[in-house]
Every structure is written in C-alpha cells, then in structure tokens.
C-alpha cells in the first residue's frame, strides 16, 4: 500500500514538473512599466494665517476659517494631482506637513514629504515655546511612485539662530530654502528640487521707487534718501539669499549628476528686477518664458483676491520707520502712493529651471484661482502649475 502511494506521488510530481516546463505553463513575463507622459510641478504659498510684527506673532483667523481653507486646498490639490508640490507658509511644522499627506491619502493619493522650519520664535522643546502656534516653514511633497530625499534645510539670511522641528532660537527674520532630490523609478532619473520664501520688506521696489521719486520731485519727502536706502536694502538681501541658494545648488550638482534642476516659491520680486536678472545670468530660466504662449500670470492680485487685499492693509514696519522723520503731510502722501503701488496685481511667485525636461512641451497655469468671482480662495496667492508633456499634441491643442 505504501509503495503504491509513493509511486502515485512520484508520478504526479514528475507530471507537474513536466507541465511547468511546457510553453503553455510558463509564468507571464513582467510587463515593463511605461513612464508617465506628463509631469506636473506646483509652487504655492498657502498663507499661514498669522500676523507677523517685529516683536510678536498672532493668529488672525479662526480655527474654523483655517480648516476651511485647508479643506478647499486639499480638494484643489486632489483635482490637479501634481507630481511634485512646493509649499510655503506651512504652519505648524511638522504636523501640518503630515496633515497634507494624510488628507491627500484620503483622496486616494500617495505622497511623501520633506520640510524645513523657517520661523519658530523661541522653542526649547515640544510644547515649550514662547509662541506655541508658530513653527512655520517650507514643505515639498512627491507623489508615488516618485521618491524624495531631503538634502538640506539651507539658511539663506538672518541673524544668529536657527529653527528645527522641535527646537529653535530666532532673534529676527530668518529665511531658508529647502533642497531635495526627487527620483522617478520608472526612468531612473533624479532631479534637484528646491523651494524658498525670500525676504519681503517694502514690496514692489521698482514701482514704489518710481512713485516716491515723483513725490520727491514735487518737493515732498525731505528724507527721501533714507527711504531709497531701505528699499535697496530689501533688494540687496534677496540678492544675497539667491547667491547662497545658487552656491548650494552648484555644490550639490558637483557631487551628484541630476537630470535637471527646478526651484520655485514666493520670491517677492518681479520680472526684470535685479534679482530676476541675477538668476538669468546664472543660467536659470523663468519657466513662463518657455511655456506655450509665454503666460505672465499675476500670482498676487489684491483687486480680485480678498485674502490678498486684507494682507495689504498693514504697512511694513520698515516703511513706517523710514517715514518717521517726515512731516505728517509727506507721510500721508508716501503712504497713499505706496498703497496705490501694492494694490496692483503682480507676479511674485516663480518656477525657475535649468535643463529640466527640456524636450517636453511645457504649459503653465494658475492654481487656486476661484472659477467665479466671489468664490472663496484657499490663499492670498495663486499658485503656478507647470505641466510637462511628451505628447506634442498637448501643445498643438493650445
């Protein structure tokens, strides 16, 4: 009986081995994964909802308002589904960065994130801070199957001190850049990606300069030179920040071969400004210049975005200080001209690149702009969404 059973088992094993060797029983060969035909990258200043003064920070919206803006933003992100998302004014970190990941996961999207705090006040440990609601900063999200690795939280400018996830010491305005590398496993290509929020100060340098120069020519503003020096200081600080950024990007490129470089954020300068020209001389291209139709979208528009209009109500402390020695009449004139200048729509958010998907068709559009006038906005800025396509008809249809 046992011998018969062994004979049967042996025969079945032999038959199964033979069947597996037959062509009809070969396991299917793994199918090659086709790389995606489009790649989307978004930069967006999300608005932290804080009022920042020289010595203090306070929340200027209710928790309900903050949550409503976040929910709207997640819906907009889920619809656009960018492959890489560059965010500024993400507060508080690291909690808010993880909130983005989890909220997008609930929409069926799998993202990973890296982040860097750029404003923290005095924070000695988790839960032990002078400004407990402040741990603002930058985040980069990458959609699966992309992988992301943080390279550097780079301090661009500011006094001694620094900010981290759970501890930090800040004695004045700090500005950081967040550098990361993003790899596409389907192609094996790795890209150098960065985001930053540059110094603001007295905004619209060139326009305000023209307005104040005109007032000075009419016999107003006896301390005009002091105002001009303050404007130039803001410009100079941003140039230093860009120099620090570009030096770091070059260093990373020396140690690793990247298929391209792209960075973006709220840069607080405008087209043809000295800072804009500085990037051009360094070999970086404003991607709007190479996009189909060369769109020049206004990313900050106080006339159509109520959140932006509200942000412009407060005058920059540096501007108030620079006017302190002027007569009341001249102060009022300078403020009027300043408000006129900053009330105009303008482009201060950018995506700059170097050798990034240069063979693709590129289109650029605004992100987060309400479809109808009066609909809510999720930020005081509109984002910029770049779509790179390797199907030429996507360009021909526009």
What residues fall within each predicted segment?
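N-terminal, active-site-proximal structural segment of metallo-dependent hydrolase catalytic domains
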Residues: 8, 18-107, 113-126, 130, ...
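Metal-dependent phosphoester-hydrolase catalytic domains
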Residues: 21-31, 247-262, 267-398
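Active-site beta-strand/loop signature of hydrolases that rely on acidic residues for catalysis
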Residues: 40-46, 73-98, 141, 180, ...
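Acidic/histidine-rich helix-loop elements
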Residues: 43-69, 161-170, 199-237
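Short aromatic-enriched loop/helix-cap "lid" or pocket-rim segments at secondary-structure transitions
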Residues: 52-57, 98-99, 125-129, 153, ...
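Sec-exported extracytoplasmic/periplasmic mature domains
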Residues: 78-82, 101-109, 146, 250-254, ...
């Amino acid at each position: 009986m046992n011998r018969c059973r062994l004979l049967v088992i042996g025969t079945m094993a032999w038959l199964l081995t033979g069947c597996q060797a037959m062509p009809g029983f070969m396991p299917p060969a793994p199918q090659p994964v086709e790389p995606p035909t489009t790649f989307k990258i978004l930069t967006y200043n999300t608005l932290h909802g804080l009022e920042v003064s020289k010595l203090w920070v306070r929340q200027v919206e209710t928790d309900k308002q903050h949550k409503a803006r976040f929910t709207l933003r997640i819906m907009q992100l889920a619809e656009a589904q960018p492959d890489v998302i560059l965010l500024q004014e993400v507060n508080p970190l690291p909690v808010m960065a993880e909130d983005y990941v989890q909220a997008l996961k609930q929409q069926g999207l799998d993202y990973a994130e890296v982040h860097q705090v750029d404003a923290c006040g005095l924070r000695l440990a988790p839960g032990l801070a002078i400004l407990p609601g402040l741990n603002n900063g930058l985040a980069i999200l990458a959609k699966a199957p992309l992988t992301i690795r943080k390279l550097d939280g780079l301090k661009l400018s500011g006094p001694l001190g620094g900010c981290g996830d759970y501890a930090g010491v800040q004695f004045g305005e700090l500005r950081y850049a967040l550098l990361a590398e993003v790899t596409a496993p389907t192609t094996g290509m790795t890209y150098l990606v960065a985001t930053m929020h540059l110094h603001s100060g007295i905004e619209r340098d060139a326009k305000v300069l023209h307005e104040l120069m005109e007032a000075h020519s009419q016999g107003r503003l006896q301390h005009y030179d002091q105002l001009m020096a303050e404007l130039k200081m803001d410009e100079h600080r941003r140039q230093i920040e860009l120099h620090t950024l570009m030096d770091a990007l070059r260093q990373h490129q020396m140690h690793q071969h990247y298929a391209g470089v792209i960075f973006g954020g709220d840069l607080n300068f405008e087209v043809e400004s000295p800072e804009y020209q500085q990037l051009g001389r360094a070999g970086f291209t404003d991607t709007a210049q190479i996009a189909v139709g060369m769109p020049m979208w206004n990313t900050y528009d106080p006339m159509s975005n109520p959140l932006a209009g509200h942000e412009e109500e407060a005058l920059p402390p540096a501007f108030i200080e620079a006017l302190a020695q002027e007569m009341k009449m001249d102060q009022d004139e300078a403020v009027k001209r300043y408000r006129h200048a900053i009330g105009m729509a303008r482009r201060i958010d950018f995506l700059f690149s170097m050798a990034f998907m240069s063979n693709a068709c590129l289109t650029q559009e605004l992100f987060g702009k309400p479809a109808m006038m009066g609909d809510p906005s999720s930020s005081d800025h509109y984002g910029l969404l770049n779509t790179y396509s390797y199907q030429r008809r996507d360009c021909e249809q526009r």
